[in-house]
């Protein structure tokens, strides 16, 4: 079975006191652009922009202050911190895990009605909708085991 130990659970989010304002990293290929000729994804960042994060079963997604482009969808969203302060203490070392996957851009639709028509305008908010990694872990758990190679 594929390991899920780097995927953030509710317990991880609570233990490390992940909260709005925390910076996250996102890997993706905005408009198909690559970081270099070797084809690596582009690393960008944003801050958690919604509350609450848990319980993930209830919230399902969270918002990241991050402008989404075509090619970002499906990209991993990573938490990475060195010497993080939580539970009132500085914890020396690196904390890293996968928070989720980019789903879409958050937008609001404005409806303007007149006597003869209704016009809808979509307003981009430069916010990414992130699917919690707990749902990725659930998917992985449904996969069949990887067959063992035979000599």
Write out the residue ranges for each language-model feature:
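Conserved catalytic-core segment of clan PA serine endopeptidases
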Residues: 1-2
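Short glycine/Trp-rich loop-beta-loop segment that forms part of the substrate-binding cleft
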Residues: 6-35
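Terminal peptide-recognition signature
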Residues: 21, 48, 73-77, 132
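Gly/Ser-enriched beta-turn/beta-hairpin loop segments
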Residues: 36-42, 51-60
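PDZ/PDZ-like groove recognition
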Residues: 111-151
């Amino acid at each position: 079975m594929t390991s899920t130990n780097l995927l953030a659970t509710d317990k991880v989010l609570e233990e490390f006191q992940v909260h709005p304002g925390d910076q996250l990293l996102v890997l993706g290929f905005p408009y198909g652009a690559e970081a270099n000729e070797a084809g690596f994804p582009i690393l960008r960042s944003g801050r958690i922009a919604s509350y609450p994060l848990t319980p993930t079963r209830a919230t399902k997604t969270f918002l990241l202050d991050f402008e989404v482009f075509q090619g970002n969808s499906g990209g991993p969203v990573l938490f990475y911190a060195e010497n993080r302060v939580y539970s009132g203490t500085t914890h020396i070392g690196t904390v890293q895990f996968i928070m989720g996957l980019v789903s879409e851009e958050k937008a609001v639709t404005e409806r303007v009605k007149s006597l003869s028509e209704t016009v809808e305008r979509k307003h981009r908010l430069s916010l990414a909708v992130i699917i919690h990694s707990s749902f990725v872990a659930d998917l992985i758990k449904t996969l069949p085991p990887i067959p063992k190679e035979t000599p």
